[in-house]
Amino acid sequence: MRLGKYNKSLGWLSLFAGTVLLSGCDSALLDPKGQIGLEQRSLILTAFGLMLIVVIPAILMAVGFAWKYRASNKDAKYSPNWSHSNKVEAVVWTVPILIILFLAVLTWKTTHALEPSKPLVHDEKPITIEVVSMDWKWFFIYPEQGIATVNEIAFPANTPVQFKVTSNSVMNSFFIPRLGSQIYAMAGMQTNLHLIANEAGTYDGISASYSGPGFSGMKFKAIATPDRAAFDQWVEKAKQSTNTMSDMAAFEKVATPSEYNKVEYFSNVKPDLFKDVIGKFMDHGKSMNMSQPEGEHSAHEGMEGMDMSHAETAH
């Protein structure tokens, strides 16, 4: 008996401790700072609420039935031959079907509305940032500003940002949790992602796909500046850097595998560097396909250069 009381007390203590510890957690997905993130949170909470319509009654009934039909309750109705109830059948089938239908319609609409490659409707002209996943760092190119950075980006708040994403190594995943969707980065291909920050701040960016021993340190900072003037100042700071990215040799030097990299800025970036990074894998594919049968080689060749805008995932 004492052991049972001890275990019960320990269980309540563990529950309380877990609640206190979890209260200190800062969930980026549930505290978004961008329009896409807000809409995704709304979808998550709506789906969660709908599922509770089934879960909560099921839990209550499980507890209630166990209490009502406990061995010590001599007043409980005993029905050993009970096997069917039209009312019960109607409830257990109708409610889940209605929930599934509602979720199906909701998911269909939001999936298309939050399509990552779909440009955001906004009065401000979008900022274009080209993203290259490396081992194990993030390389960012600003084609309009003529600069590049490692593990840091900046853009004005309340201004759409178009991310063009590829990889210089294995498949990876580009993700700024507080702003919204993640997108895959794949060598020789380009994926597109559109995000916006509703307020100024510095947000954590991560790699959401395991890519090797340096994966855990593959993080970056996304700075949403208060206005365009602050963004221009950040650009000017990058342009003052003595580091340059004038050719592919300089790019390959930066792309050398390394872990826990510091922020770097580059001025005088080679034009069309992003396209060249994609192109070097496409050329490699051509040479590799030369050993394949002619028909198979032609099929692969026809796929080269495709924009994977519709191959990404939004979640």
Language model region names:
Residues 1-27:
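N-terminal secretory/membrane targeting signals
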Residues 10-13, 44, 49, 90:
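Hydrophobic alpha-helical transmembrane segments
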Residues 16-20, 52, 56, 93, ...:
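Alpha-helical transmembrane spans of integral membrane proteins, capturing the lipid-embedded, hydrophobic core
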Residues 17-22, 45, 51, 83:
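Generic secretory/membrane-interface signal
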Residues 20, 61-64, 106-109:
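Transmembrane alpha-helix boundary/anchor motif
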Residues 26-43, 68-315:
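Non-transmembrane, membrane-proximal soluble domains of secreted or membrane proteins
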Residues 40-57:
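Alpha-helical transmembrane segments
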Residues 57-72:
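Membrane-water interface of transmembrane alpha-helices
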